Amino acid sequence: MKFLDKAIIHVIAGNGGHGRTSFRREKYIPKGGPDGGDGGNGGNVWLQTVTNLNTLIDFKFTKIFKAQDGQQGFNKKKTGKKGSDIVIQIPIGTKIIDHNTNEIIEDMIQDKQLVLVAKGGWHGLGNTRFKSSTNRIPIKHTKGTQGEFRILRLELILIAHVGTLGLPNSGKSTLVRNISNAKTKIANYPFTTLKPVLGTVKINHKEFFVIADIPGLIQGASHGIGLGYQFLKHLERCHLLLHIIDISQINFKNTITNIHVILDELKTYNKILHNKPIWFVFNKIDLIDDIDINTKLKSILEKLGSIQQYFLISAIKKTGLKKIVKKIYDFLKNKNLL
């Protein structure tokens, strides 16, 4: 399924049904009193989250949603039927924004969360309502009111406990694929990942965490260069970021430069992202010998100064993956984030 994280839709609530003017007409009662019923209320438009969606692609093809109008009132004081509501399903993590005012109506982060986005029109009154001691045969009835109309902007921000980031071809997708159920594409060329992918990492039959893989970042990503910039927002809800680094490069100075490229892009894009816990994951240790690893790591750590956590792994050989999964789980568990 194609990934789409922005959409604009039009929602139209149903109009209220008009009241009716009518009079009782039965055998032997040719001139009965008023018996016009009220109309029915218009249907409402709701948005509700579901777990089986992770894209807004459906709204690329269907953009207008209209609830049913209320029925007009009937004679014999019968009320018109209320218009049926409609419930539009959206992925968890969708922000609902009024397109005209930029007001955030709701940030939908819970399963089965339901929010009213367009209220149906109020019913009109039948002429029975206007009977009085001074007006025995009222002919007046009122019309139902129009339902609300709104233009909504939907913005999906995926929900994951952990997010991965790094340069293209650093091994992010291989890591995510080998520790979770994610079916990410893997190949030895840059920009293999073209859209965010979520994977579930199972700890046991009850406990798990969700990890997000976004396209690789390059210098200038925060200003729109490359593929990853448009997906950086999907890291905003993550509690922990894993910075995946290719340690197999010949010149360790290039490694240092690449690390700072990613950190600078985070800071430029969003200080919230830059201030999140970031663990450094040095990947591709299978491509160099232990002496080179230790020499490079020592030089890198000296240049970086204090860092929160670091790991040495080979994502493709699955070396060190159990350790990092355990550390992530402990981190999330200790902070009551699971």
UniProtKB/Swiss-Prot annotation:
Start and end residues of each OBG-type G domain: 160-333
Cellular component aspect of the GO annotation: cytoplasm
Source superkingdom: Bacteria
Localization per record: Cytoplasm
Catalytic EC class: hydrolase
One of the protein's GO biological processes: ribosome biogenesis
Gene Ontology molecular functions: GTP binding; GTPase activity; magnesium ion binding
Binding site for Mg(2+): S173, T193
Keywords carried by this UniProt record: Cytoplasm, GTP-binding, Hydrolase, Magnesium, Metal-binding, Nucleotide-binding
EC number from the UniProt entry: 3.6.5.-
Cofactor(s) of this protein: Mg(2+)
Start and end residues of each Obg domain: 1-159
PROSITE patterns (alphabetical): G_OBG, GTP1_OBG, OBG
Primary role: An essential GTPase which binds GTP, GDP and possibly (p)ppGpp with moderate affinity, with high nucleotide exchange rates and a fairly low GTP hydrolysis rate. Plays a role in control of the cell cycle, stress response, ribosome biogenesis and in those bacteria that undergo differentiation, in morphogenesis control.
Family that this chain belongs to: Belongs to the TRAFAC class OBG-HflX-like GTPase superfamily. OBG GTPase family.
Quaternary structure, from the entry: Monomer.
Identification of the protein by name: GTPase Obg
Gene transcribed to yield this protein: obg
